[in-house]
């Protein structure tokens, strides 16, 4: 801020006017600074997220380091979702994405839902679980009631249920959206052929070998065509983009029409 010279009336003529004007100036500049530095590229937030899992066992810590790096520390979600939005993350796992979104914008209201009670307990009782205000719910996505939200997220979670239940879950999610809300689905695209093989292999490794993720049925991945049909049937706009260039990971953004 430039030095204010004696007699300068830029910020008012009285001490009261100057005090109020300068307060507004610092608030405005602080918000600008937060917009620049409260992003996933800031090493502070990356380190804070990973350190949240260092006393939860070597496998979980290693998994988080790899997973968060592969997911770009959730920069796509941070830039997509407004900083005052209400968010429900269905299939939150250990809530790493929710913690990042909450750290970057504390004014967000976030609900983290997962079927695995163990993961919910680990997340709830972690440092960030107590610090960020993320609200945890343990339950099956097919039966649990979703909170009213601006954004409902399904990140690599829909493929744990069959096609019929996928449709039912998404329909219930639509009913839980606030006006102008969005459903964001990130999952492997079954129609991508060879590129989809990597996703299937990693899920096999995760569910059958390491038993890191719980599943009671065979995996069922949606396709781009399936998602487009669903959007048309429910009068929603849809945006589709490739999430990770090395596999079939695809981002589907379903928007309610006003």
Report residues per predicted region:
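N-terminal, positively charged/glycine-rich alpha-helical extensions of SAM-dependent methyltransferases
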Residues: 2-57
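Conserved alpha-helix/loop element of class I SAM-dependent methyltransferases that forms part
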Residues: 67-83
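Conserved glycine-rich SAM-binding loop
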Residues: 93
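Class I SAM-dependent methyltransferase SAM/SAH-binding core
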Residues: 96, 100-132
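Conserved SAM-binding strand-loop segment of SAM-dependent methyltransferases
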Residues: 130-141
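A conserved beta-strand element that flanks and buttresses the S-adenosyl-L-methionine
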Residues: 153
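A short glycine-rich, Lys/Arg-flanked "PGG" loop and its adjoining helix->strand segment in the class I
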Residues: 167-179
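C-terminal alpha-helical "lid/dimerization" subdomain adjacent to the S-adenosyl-L-methionine
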Residues: 186-230, 241-242
